[in-house]
């Protein structure tokens, strides 16, 4: 199935700014997040939206996508990579050293990196937390100390490759007879032959276990960000260091707050009377309620800033702000007494907008007159 255009997925123009792309992503991610949207296709749509954002928010990826779209520009050349040209890669390796030379199969090598996705509640990401996770990973076998051989014995040099981990294969080519180096399939490139295998690991030198790891989630971590735990990945090879563990965070949306970087946004519903006469209201923040004065005559859409009431910066650079946007609620059901009072008010005010809006309505009148 062909992929949809990334701009179409986010519903933005091809010339959209980075802020417009980010705003569209936040809106759609909130809409299709699996923890909020229980539709069968919500998770697929969420992944599609994230994939589109990851590409269009990165200048290099965006430039590549704008030029080539979903098409791999190298696919007409064997999908890219010299390895796809079969025997010719070995010829170039011989003349130009493309293979990087002969590697020692017994040299210490770092273990593979691992990735773990951790889901956080909105406020857990804001304030941070300490938790314990359990991950499956390969660890060095303690019975054989990673050698793969039965205790009291040692691995022997592979008789087929002489311990090099590679076999030399002669081949006729248009350039003449050449020698190609291939990984020895007898020892799988290790250069070792284990006659008496360790009963615990079966000769692999590693065993798969579930490891408990303590994780300190930093305050202010955001959705999609990651942290690295050095040395918590797969065990190293031939005594090499262990790989790293990368923890990627999936932050659930909040029903009241929205987050953009270190700033928090929310809407406060107010009545016509409150905004017309002014009022002092209580506003929920991440750290509890605070009082906010609403000046008389406040219009719907007006935004107030609560400095320092946002999210702590994950790198320790201060704290964001909270933005409170006023939303005037029009009552749907009125008693007869309330209707009578509103009619009386309309007669007293002349049924026309406030003076401060005269300039706006003057523009509307001029527009109708042409």
Swiss-Prot record:
Q: Which GO terms describe its biological process?
A: chaperone cofactor-dependent protein refolding; DNA replication; protein refolding; response to heat
- One cellular component term from this protein's GO annotations in UniProt: cytoplasm
Superkingdom assignment: Bacteria
Keyword vocabulary terms for this entry? Chaperone, Cytoplasm, DNA replication, Metal-binding, Repeat, Stress response, Zinc, Zinc-finger
Q: Could you give the cofactor binding note from the entry?
A: Binds 2 Zn(2+) ions per monomer.
- GO MF annotations in UniProt: ATP binding; heat shock protein binding; unfolded protein binding; zinc ion binding
Ranges for the CXXCXGXG motif repeats: 141-148, 158-165, 184-191, 198-205
Q: Does the keyword Zinc-finger apply?
A: yes
Q: Which InterPro entries has this protein been placed in?
A: DnaJ, DnaJ_C, DnaJ_domain, DnaJ_domain_CS, HSP40/DnaJ_pept-bd, HSP_DnaJ_Cys-rich_dom, HSP_DnaJ_Cys-rich_dom_sf, J_dom_sf
Record-linked Gene3D superfamilies: DnaJ domain, Heat shock protein DnaJ, cysteine-rich domain, Urease metallochaperone UreE, N-terminal domain
Residue intervals of every CR-type zinc finger in the record: 128-210
* UniProt binding sites for Zn(2+) 1: 141, 144, 198, 201
Reported cofactor(s): Zn(2+)
UniProt xrefs under NCBIfam families: DnaJ_bact (TIGR02349), PRK10767.1 (NF008035), PRK14276.1 (NF010869), PRK14280.1 (NF010873), PRK14287.1 (NF010880)
What family does this belong to?
Answer: Belongs to the DnaJ family.
Q: How does it assemble?
A: Homodimer.
**Role of this protein:** Participates actively in the response to hyperosmotic and heat shock by preventing the aggregation of stress-denatured proteins and by disaggregating proteins, also in an autonomous, DnaK-independent fashion. Unfolded proteins bind initially to DnaJ; upon interaction with the DnaJ-bound protein, DnaK hydrolyzes its bound ATP, resulting in the formation of a stable complex. GrpE releases ADP from DnaK; ATP binding to DnaK triggers the release of the substrate protein, thus completing the reaction cycle.
Please provide the record's free-text comment about the domains of this protein.
The J domain is necessary and sufficient to stimulate DnaK ATPase activity. Zinc center 1 plays an important role in the autonomous, DnaK-independent chaperone activity of DnaJ. Zinc center 2 is essential for interaction with DnaK and for DnaJ activity.
Name under which the protein is recorded: Chaperone protein DnaJ
Output the lineage of the source organism: Bacteria, Bacillati, Bacillota, Bacilli, Bacillales
């Amino acid at each position: 199935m062909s992929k949809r255009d990334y701009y179409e997925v986010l519903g933005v123009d091809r010339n959209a700014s980075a802020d417009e792309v980010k705003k569209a992503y936040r809106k759609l991610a909130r809409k299709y997040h699996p923890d909020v949207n229980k539709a069968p296709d919500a998770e697929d749509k969420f992944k599609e939206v994230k994939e589109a954002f990851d590409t269009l928010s990165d200048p290099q990826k965006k430039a590549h996508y704008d030029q080539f779209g979903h098409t791999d520009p190298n696919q007409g050349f064997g999908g890219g990579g010299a390895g796809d040209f079969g025997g010719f890669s070995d010829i170039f390796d011989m003349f130009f050293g493309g293979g990087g030379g002969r590697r020692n199969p017994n040299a210490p090598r770092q273990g593979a990196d691992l990735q773990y996705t951790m889901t956080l509640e909105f406020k857990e990401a804001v304030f941070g937390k300490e938790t314990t996770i359990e991950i499956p990973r390969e660890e060095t076998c303690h019975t054989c100390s990673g050698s793969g051989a039965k205790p009291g014995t040692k691995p022997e040099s592979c008789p087929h490759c002489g311990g090099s981990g590679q076999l030399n294969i002669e081949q006729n080519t248009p350039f003449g007879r050449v020698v190609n180096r291939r990984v020895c399939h007898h020892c799988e490139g290790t250069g070792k032959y284990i006659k008496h295998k360790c009963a615990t690991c079966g000769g692999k030198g590693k065993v798969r276990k579930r490891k408990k790891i303590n994780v300190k989630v930093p305050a202010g971590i955001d959705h999609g960000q990651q942290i690295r735990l050095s040395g918590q990945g797969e065990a190293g090879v031939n005594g090499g260091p262990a790989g790293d563990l990368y923890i990627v965070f999936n932050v659930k949306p909040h029903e009241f707050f929205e987050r953009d970087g270190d700033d928090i946004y929310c809407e406060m519903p107010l009545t016509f009377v409150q905004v017309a006469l002014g009022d002092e209201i209580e506003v929920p923040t991440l750290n509890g309620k605070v009082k906010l004065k609403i000046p008389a005559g406040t219009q719907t859409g007006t935004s107030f800033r609560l400095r320092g009431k946002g999210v702590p910066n994950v790198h320790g650079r201060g704290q964001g702000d909270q933005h409170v946007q006023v939303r005037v609620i029009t009552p749907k059901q009125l008693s007869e007494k309330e209707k009578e009072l509103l009619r009386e008010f309309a007669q007293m005010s002349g049924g026309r907008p406030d003076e401060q809006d005269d300039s706006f309505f003057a523009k509307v009148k001029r527009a109708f007159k042409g």
